[in-house]
């Protein structure tokens, strides 16, 4: 499913379709795409405090906008899949992470 969506997003970038929201994002450029990713990430955090359906909807929006970002930066979805696969089974401890303060 994600592969199909990513391919459709790339197709919109290569073959613009008038009235397409995806093309609107590409036309506005990287700053607009980044703004949308940030907005959607914030909405995911808020939705997580509410009901499951809202969270599902917001995670879906964020996922779509992240795929648009990858397409804008010409990063294949396979690169993300490879990175995740490379991390599989690796141990991580809290000491490996920087502390997040003031939440």
From Swiss-Prot:
**Compartment list:** Cytoplasm
Q: Which reaction does it catalyse?
A: 1-(5-phospho-beta-D-ribosyl)-ATP + H2O = 1-(5-phospho-beta-D-ribosyl)-5'-AMP + diphosphate + H(+)
Q: Which pathway or pathways does this protein act in?
A: Amino-acid biosynthesis; L-histidine biosynthesis; L-histidine from 5-phospho-alpha-D-ribose 1-diphosphate: step 2/9
Name the coiled-coil region(s): none
Q: Name one GO molecular function term.
A: ATP binding
Q: Which UniProt keywords apply?
A: Amino-acid biosynthesis, ATP-binding, Cytoplasm, Histidine biosynthesis, Hydrolase, Nucleotide-binding
- From what organism does this protein derive? Listeria monocytogenes serotype 4a (strain HCC23)
UniProt keyword annotation of tRNA-binding present: no
- List the protein's name: Phosphoribosyl-ATP pyrophosphatase
Show the HAMAP family listed in the entry.
HisE
Into which EC class is this enzyme placed? hydrolase
Encoded by which gene? hisE
Which Gene Ontology cellular component terms are annotated?
cytoplasm
């Amino acid at each position: 499913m994600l592969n199909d969506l990513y391919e459709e997003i790339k197709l919109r970038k290569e073959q613009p379709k008038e009235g397409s929201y995806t093309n609107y994002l590409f036309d506005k450029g990287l700053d607009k795409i980044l703004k949308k990713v940030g907005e959607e990430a914030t909405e995911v955090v808020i939705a997580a405090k509410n009901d499951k359906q809202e969270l599902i909807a917001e995670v879906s929006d964020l996922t779509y906008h992240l795929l648009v970002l990858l397409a804008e930066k010409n990063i294949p979805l396979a690169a993300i899949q490879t990175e995740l696969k490379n991390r599989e089974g690796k141990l991580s401890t809290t000491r490996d992470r920087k502390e997040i303060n003031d939440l």
